[in-house]
Amino acid sequence: MQVNIAPSWKPYLEEEFNKPYFEQLAAFVKAEYKSNTIYPPAKQIFNAFELCSFDNTKVVILGQDPYHGFKQANGLSFSVGKEVRMPPSLVNIFKEIESDLGHPVPTNGDLTRWAQQGVLLLNATLTVREKQPGSHQNKGWETFTDTIISILSQHKQHLVFMLWGNYAQKKEVLIDTSKHLVLKSAHPSPYAADRGFFGNKHFSKANAYLVEHGLTPINW
């Protein structure tokens, strides 16, 4: 399994990579890529950590599983490649940004530009079998990504965590809310967006918090 991450993550994660659970996870993932169609492409599994360094992280947006459709997942939660049709949840995210900040909906759903500004687009599970949502859950990824959240909470100051939906909100227990901002709402999926995602103004709230603490806001 290729672990491509920005250098500033390495002091915090090298110990994690050597733990027995991660070695078992890596063996499982390697075998899965050999025998099945797995997303994202192997070289993009750690894309979130390659594009958004530990030092640069300002905002964390937590997803659950990578997209499981053809060529959708690119290693960033909610993001898709430029040539791929935007999934409904991502369309709703852009609709909320348009309502909140007045930014027009972009022509593609590649969120690389967010990651490069310090938005860690983190799925709880980093791989999935094609057309089998949840197929790589409970194999060790959640242990790893929970550790990421805990490390960020412990070692960083004034982060914004966006927790959308019940699954993501369960991760709040890992976050020190006395020194970070946690924003919670319904999930942006079409089944839930009308129950509190639309109108949550998370993007303007995040930027106001960053500016308040002397940090550059995100160009959403």
Curated annotation (Swiss-Prot):
One GO biological process this protein is involved in is: base-excision repair, AP site formation via deaminated base removal
Catalytic residues (positions): 65
Q: Which CDD domains did the record assign?
A: UDG-F1-like
Tell me where it mainly resides.
cytoplasm
> Where found in the cell?
Cytoplasm
The protein's matches in SUPFAM superfamilies, at most eight in alphabetical order, are given as: Uracil-DNA glycosylase-like
* Reaction(s) the record says it catalyses: Hydrolyzes single-stranded DNA or mismatched double-stranded DNA and polynucleotides, releasing free uracil
- Write down the PROSITE patterns for this protein, in alphabetical order: U_DNA_GLYCOSYLASE
Q: Print the keywords alphabetically.
A: Cytoplasm, DNA damage, DNA repair, Hydrolase
Q: What is its EC number?
A: 3.2.2.27
Q: SMART domains this protein is in?
A: UDG (SM00986), UreE_C (SM00987)
Q: Name one GO molecular function term.
A: uracil DNA N-glycosylase activity
State the top-level EC class: hydrolase
- Specify the domain of life of the species encoding this protein: Bacteria
- Membership in a protein family: Belongs to the uracil-DNA glycosylase (UDG) superfamily. UNG family.
Q: What does this protein do?
A: Excises uracil residues from the DNA which can arise as a result of misincorporation of dUMP residues by DNA polymerase or due to deamination of cytosine.
Q: Which HAMAP family match?
A: UDG
UniProt name for this protein: Uracil-DNA glycosylase
Organism name: Amoebophilus asiaticus (strain 5a2)
**What does the record give as the organism's lineage?**
Bacteria, Pseudomonadati, Bacteroidota, Cytophagia, Cytophagales
Annotated gene: ung
